[in-house]
Amino acid sequence: YAQIAPHLYCGPVVGAANIQLATCTPNFLILESIQKWDGFQAEILKTPIEWQDGYVIPSIEPGLGIELDEDVARANPYTDTALHLTMDLDPID
């Protein structure tokens, strides 16, 4: 099998999905991300994604293993007008 390295440019929900994919894929190589899911990305989860010595520790909770803190989500609505999907340093208007 060819090894896979899922690339992640989204937040912690997609991160949790990639972690679950990685744990059940025998040809998984590395989990690639542009973020560490800290700050707001940790606050929006009731239990943040856990890291130890550079490794993600998969959740033992059911499903994706995460639960959103909806109070945090409501307190931080998305108000921007652009979606940053490129490797540019600044958001695109």
Q: Which role fits each region the language model picked out?
A:
Residues 64-93:
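Extended hydrophobic packing segments that form well-structured cores
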